[in-house]
Amino acid sequence: MKITFLGTGTSCGVPTLGCSCKVCRSTNPHDSRLRCAALVETDTTRLLIDCGPDIRQQLMPLPFRRIDGVLLTHMHYDHVGGIDDLRPYCRFGTIPLYGDRKTLRHVRQCMPYCFPHGLVQRIEKSLPWLKLKLYPGVPSLSLNPIHAHRSFSVGDIEVLPINVLHGKLPILGFRIGRDFAYITDMKSMPEDELQYLKGVRTLVVNALRFEKPHHSHQLVADAVAFAHKVGAEQTWLIHFNHDIGLETEAQAKLPRNVGLAYDGLEIEV
């Protein structure tokens, strides 16, 4: 199974608008970070994790092939704001979106034109003489509620949602297959959730920066401690802002089995 890191930045991305710090001025491409998203691929299945406002740019260099589903960690714009940009992929068929009920409700409310079918059916039932036609440019998407600790499959990829806290907001992390887990925007995780990560060998987890605590995101030290709890053999950090520092300098501060992921990084798990 191949994982491609499409974006490894926070909601503002890096460079940050209006900033002239050394990270935002860096010419090292690994210091430029789009909003967080990832692509999980097997020989037969392609699964997106999150779909933020940079998704068009992130998918442009990749082969144009069917997307079998999208896992949504939570409702914030930097994780769902690019869903409409998936419409070219709908020529391969309807794209299922998977998320908790609150996230899916938010997506429907923000993009009602993407989900007109229920409304059309209700109108046709009450006013059968009114001949309605769907706008042909509307993307074909389906909303599929998922629940923590209830596994499901997308193609040949098995997914187990896990409870995570983004500050006070409950969100989802994902164990994908037997050996891999992807968690972003975490501040904390209930202790009883750790059992669902037992045996994970490759962990992806967020780490905003080294210093200055944040109310809803963990720092690098928190992420390293969490990886130790999980017992992962290899950990990749994501969701940085420009305070993380230059990639080469930041990487030198990390343990041997913890790496700073960067946009475009591909790993096999």
Protein language model annotation of sequence segments:
Residues S188-E268:
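Cap/insert and terminal regions of metallo-dependent hydrolase folds
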Residues M1-Y182, D192, E249-V269:
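Binuclear metal-dependent hydrolase catalytic cores
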